[in-house]
Design a protein with these regions (language model features):
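Divalent metal-dependent phosphate-bond-processing catalytic cores, especially two-metal-ion Mg2+/Mn2+ enzymes
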Residues: 2-17, 31-61, 74, 110-202
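His-Asp-centered metal-binding catalytic motifs of divalent-metal-dependent phosphohydrolases/nucleases
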Residues: 45-49, 63-93, 103-111
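Amphipathic alpha-helical interface surfaces
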Residues: 84-88, 100, 116-119, 136
């Protein structure tokens, strides 16, 4: 019998890993003792991100909604750590989920100005404060006080500009105006397209 050698350091060897469905995402969040208010925020971001996907799809722009959903549910998985976007992204890269890693690591700043799954989660995160739907301007005005250094303020301004550009792109593609709506999001099943339209001025 021929002996088979497997090296876990071999980049061509990929450990099997389960699909990141909602149940597994929730178990992972609980495993790191993510506070309830952070989980509620993540759920609100997820709902809005999926709404954006549905609206884009209805206009002919197709994205991987399962990837968006999982990435949004997990985007703050390392919230209790310093540099949580980078830390969370590195964690999921090590776990064998490179696409999820990209979404998590970029939710505090996109590498490219491209409308993709990471950009959708990034924008949804910037339109949700805690669980409340807000404007980009309010979200960034309220978070400016956290920026204590010139570098932090510069990064904050770059994120604001990225969020504005993405909002303009989606509004143009979908022929809508994103409204703040004052909507408070709660967990629940996927909304139908008609319900999704409640969150927009069309």
């Amino acid at each position: 019998m021929k002996k088979i050698n497997i090296s876990f350091s071999d980049p061509s060897y990929i450990l099997p890993h389960p699909e990141l469905n909602d149940g597994l995402c929730l178990r992972l969040r609980n495993a790191v003792s993510l506070p309830r208010h952070v989980q509620a925020h993540s759920d609100a971001v997820t709902e809005l991100a999926c709404c954006l996907c549905n609206m884009l799809e209805s206009n002919g722009y197709i994205f991987d909604q399962k990837l968006v959903r999982s990435g949004a549910l997990l985007h703050d998985i390392a919230r209790l750590q310093r540099h949580h976007a980078k830390t969370g992204g590195e964690l999921f890269l090590q776990l064998g989920y490179p696409e999820i890693s990209q979404i998590i690591s970029q939710h505090h700043g996109l590498l490219e100005a491209t409308l993709d799954e990471a950009a959708i989660v990034f924008l949804a995160d910037k339109l949700i404060q805690e669980t409340q739907r807000v404007t980009i301007e309010k979200r960034f005005a309220d978070s400016m006080s956290k920026c204590k250094s010139p570098e932090a303020r510069k990064a904050h301004e770059q994120q604001l500009e990225q969020a504005r550009k993405l909002q303009d792109i989606i509004q143009s593609l979908c022929h809508i105006t994103l409204s703040s709506g004052g909507q408070t999001y709660t967990t629940g099943a996927e909304k139908s397209l008609n319900l999704v339209r409640r969150y927009f001025i069309i």
